[in-house]
UniProtKB/Swiss-Prot annotation:
This is Protein translocase subunit SecA. It is a peripheral membrane protein. Its main location: membrane. Gene3D superfamilies: Helical scaffold and wing domains of SecA, P-loop containing nucleotide triphosphate hydrolases. Monomer and homodimer. Part of the essential Sec protein translocation apparatus which comprises SecA, SecYEG and auxiliary proteins SecDF. Other proteins may also be involved. ATP binds at Q77, G95, E96, G97, K98, T99, D532. Belongs to the SecA family.
């Protein structure tokens, strides 16, 4: 009860502002005057006084929306807009008009000319929403663009600018005069041709220079990573991270938080290794040679398994450093066979393994699991094995979105994850009231003994409802289960649509028809998110849309999303979940308790058991799973936060190099290089000149050195600087271009290798938890040491390569750009490979982190 009291208190403050907005009547103000008023605000608004203009801007946007697209934001939508402007999460039920809500805070913040990003879950929604809301922005003199995953970018422009200018002169509107209802149907709109828009292709950089940019979460993240791989500052596309509104915020910031964005390129591992270890994995017996933990998604070899593998491979010690790769191949092969299922985690299509997004059920073509896992699955399925990828750049969504100065989000379901939004992103959740009361009926769960009994009951329920014409939407958790149910419905001659990853091109169209009389739709997870299901004629009288869930998800939130497809905007609706003791979440986390209850009440075959207590028990199981997943995400974030500080240091150093500070970079490198040599080979003031000379062989320096530390330091500086200046003179104007190119290659290659090593460390430190060591502290210690060593290598190699450079042709630079184009984006599962920990001897001398900021 307290939770909602708090929400009510928060809403009171917003209602006061709504009252002020409603006091401003702009319906008789000429179009040209509205635009002029916004222009005046644009000239006076600043980051400090932005809140003072909220009431006026929201009132103008409301009126412009009514005139250009025929939608007038309701009072509750104004509240949603205020919540977003304040950098919070607005929980708004399905059908409450989140797309329109976003326009008000977008316009208000876009007036600051720093760029506002609207983040959606797919290209279709980004394009649809930018074009749908585009007339509002264009009428107010703002530029709006769309970026998509095909690396195409578009600006939304007037189809006929003269017609729009005529609309301003003659005060035309799509809203007919005298129309008094609050919602304007499409067939009643007038003058629509004055406000038609189209897309004009532009560059990615131009898209980010627009006031408002719509796009997917993956593209915004990948553009940031790509910007930090360029070899010229002009090639960067983004201009900063000021304000982002994330649509379906729970899906992007929570469900996908365990999925780092990765830019990678090809490796040199042999396909034959994967095939060989695929055969070895087939010979190992589960629970004899290895154990599988489905909760943690890990595979661990038993002692018996280790001995058996050593015998099979004819080696003495599987954990010997020279055999570490064999362990890596083997564990990946075992995971491919026992943790990744065909038609659930991936599908095989035209000889290719394509990942299925576990949250949306969509296919992710072009995305690959990293660390050799994808190749292991290809070996298992007997399809051609593609080369393994090397990581060039990576970031988690958590750390990408935390870069924004202000971050807001909207979704139909967020309150259950409020703690995570607050802890990780500093965002409060505000539940926005619905415009009309919600009258959907949510029934208690029906629980069956077996999955077969459950599906028979689902088919029987669909048949009963279909006969009376009531539309039914069935949610499943995998493609496999969608198709199983589809086959059962075919046998009963029930016409239906299947909506899953295999058919997502038709997604929006199928979802939009799901509320028509007699429609039966099977959908994987939340396929079709963002598309409203409107009820057809006569459907309200039949009870509205029936939602059937065929399994509980790991998160209550995803169940609520499925339920939320019915009962939009005060429509009637109903939801029921059909479950069985064989469902994954019940089997893994709570099956024994439920089975005891089933046995106690002696349920007959095919009969369900339903009781509010059982629904609560399942909810407790979900809360348990949610807390496990939250802990995993938090753990990942803690590790990535360590990496994030290092990433920012490297990227800031990269920018420093791109800006052409070559001399300073060389002096930094030289200072570090000399200091490390002296630390290692000098005791107080006396130095071991023989060992120093050996270290200097990489620079082709073989001189008689002074005995004291200070003199040696000065002497080395003089020699190195003399050679540096000679090289500058030798290459003339080309030196700066060549030197920058070399410095960037050295930095990028070392950072790439470092990212690969960090993945191994993540795996190794997770094993140390068994030895009562805190994995996060271990990870920090290990990566700090590794980062320090990497910086030493960067400095050393920078000196060596700079002093030995020769002229490079323009071809070399073109070749480098081609290499960058070969890099591809990748879907990276949370690290699962279990590796033998490899210890590295600590280097002598104190630790220093020397990075130019």
């Amino acid at each position: 009860m307290k939770l909602f009291d708090k929400n009510e208190r928060v809403l009171k403050r917003y209602w006061k502002r709504v009252k002020k907005i409603n006091e401003i009547n702009l319906s008789n103000v000429p179009f040209s005057e509205l635009i002029l008023n916004m222009e005046k605000i644009k000239n006076n608004i600043t980051g400090e006084n932005i809140d003072d203009y909220l009431v006026d801007v929201f009132a103008i946007v409301r009126e412009i929306a009514k005139r250009t697209i025929g939608l007038r934001p309701f009072d509750v939508q104004l509240i949603g807009g205020m919540v977003l402007h304040e950098g919070k999460v607005a929980e708004m039920k399905t059908g409450e008009g989140k797309t329109l809500v976003a326009t008000m805070p977008i316009v208000l913040n876009a007036l600051l000319k720093k760029g506002v990003h609207l983040v959606t879950v797919n290209d279709y929604l980004a394009k649809r929403d930018a074009m749908w809301m585009g007339p509002i922005y264009l009428a107010l003199g703002l530029r709006v663009a769309v970026i998509n995953t095909q690396n195409k970018s578009y600006e939304v422009v007037w189809k006929n600018k003269e017609l729009f200018e005529k609309a301003i002169r003659e005060n035309l509107s799509v809203w007919p005069e005298g129309f008094a209802e609050e919602f304007l149907p499409d067939d009643k709109k007038v003058n629509t041709d004055c406000f038609d828009v189209e897309l004009k292709e532009i560059t990615r950089k131009e898209a980010y220079e627009c006031d408002i940019t719509y796009g997917t979460n993956t593209e915004f993240g990948f553009d940031y990573l790509r910007d930090n791989l360029v070899i010229n500052l002009d090639s960067r596309v983004q201009r900063g991270h000021f304000f982002a509104i994330v649509d379906e915020v729970d899906s992007i910031l929570i469900d996908e938080a365990r999925t780092p964005l990765v830019i990678s390129g090809p490796s040199k591992t042999k396909a034959s290794d994967y095939r060989r270890f695929n055969q070895v994995a087939k010979r190992l017996k589960k629970d004899v040679h290895f154990t599988v933990d489905e909760k943690k998604k890990t595979v661990v070899l038993t002692d018996e398994g280790i001995e058996y593998v050593e015998k099979l491979l004819n080696i003495e010690n599987l954990y010997d450093p020279e055999h570490v790769n064999k362990m890596y191949f083997l564990l990946n092969a075992l995971k491919a066979h026992h943790l990744f299922k065909k038609d659930v985690d991936y599908i095989v299509n035209n000889g290719e393994v394509i990942i299925v997004d576990e949250f949306t059920g969509r296919l992710l073509p072009g995305r690959r699991y990293s660390g050799g896992l994808h190749q292991a699955i290809e070996a298992k399925e007997g399809v051609p094995i593609k080369e393994e990828s090397l990581t060039y750049a990576t970031i988690t969504y958590q750390n990408y979105f935390r870069m924004y100065k202000k971050l807001a989000g909207m979704t139909g379901t967020a309150k259950t994850e409020e703690e995570e939004f607050k802890q990780i992103y500093g965002m409060e959740v505000v539940v926005i009231p619905t415009h009309k009361p919600m009258i959907r009926k949510d029934r208690d769960d029906l629980i069956y003994r077996t999955e077969e009994e459950k599906f028979q009951a689902v088919v029987s329920e669909i048949k009963k409802r279909h006969e009376k014409g009531q539309p039914v939407l069935v949610g499943t958790t995998s493609i496999e289960k969608s198709e199983r149910l589809s086959q059962m419905l075919k046998k009963e001659n029930i016409p239906h649509n299947v909506l899953n990853a295999k058919y997502h091109e038709k997604e929006a169209e199928i979802v939009a028809r799901a509320g028509q009389r007699g429609a039966v739709t099977i959908a994987t997870n939340m396929a079709g998110r963002g598309t409203d299901i409107k009820l057809g004629p006569g459907v309200k009288e039949l009870g509205g849309l029936l939602i059937i869930g065929t399994e509980r998800h790991e998160s209550r939130r995803i169940d609520n999303q499925l339920r939320g497809r019915a009962g939009r905007q005060g429509d009637p609706g109903e939801s029921i979940f059909f479950l069985s003791l064989e469902d994954d979440i019940i089997r893994i986390f709570g099956g024994e308790k439920l089975e005891k209850i089933m046995n106690l009440v002696k349920i007959e075959k095919g009969e369900p058991i339903y009781h509010p207590m059982l629904t609560k028990l399942i909810e407790r199981v979900q809360k348990k799973v949610e807390s496990i997943n939250f802990a995993i995400r938090k753990n990942l974030l803690q590790m990535d936060t360590v990496l994030d500080a290092q990433r920012k240091a490297i990227y800031s150093y990269r920018e420093y190099l791109l800006s052409g500070n070559l001399d300073e970079h060389f002096y930094d490198a030289m200072e570090d290089f000399i200091e490390r040599i002296l630390e290692e080979f000098c005791e107080k003031e006396v130095c071991d000149t023989q060992k120093i000379n050996e270290s200097l062989k990489i620079l082709n320096i073989d001189e008689k050195l002074p005995d004291t530390r200070e003199e040696t330091k000065k002497y080395l500086k003089d020699i190195i600087l003399k050679r540096y200046n000679k090289k500058k003179e030798e290459l003339g104007e080309d030196f700066s271009k060549i030197g920058k190119y070399i410095a960037l290659r050295v930095l990028d290659e070392n950072w790439r290798q470092y990212l690969e090593e960090v993945e191994h460390v993540k795996e190794a430190v997770s094993l140390r938890a068994y030895g009562q060591k805190d994995p996060i502290i271990e990870f920090k210690k290990e990566t700090f040491r590794m980062f320090d060593e990497m910086m030493a290598r960067i400095y050393e190699q920078s000196i060596v390569y700079t002093l030995n450079i020769r002229k490079i042709t323009d071809e070399a630079e073109k070749e480098s750009k081609k290499e960058l184009e070969k890099l591809y984006v990748q879907h990276d599962e949370f690290s699962l490979v279990n590796r033998k920990e490899r210890r590295t001897a600590e280097k002598k001398g104190k630790k220093r982190l020397k990075v130019k900021r």
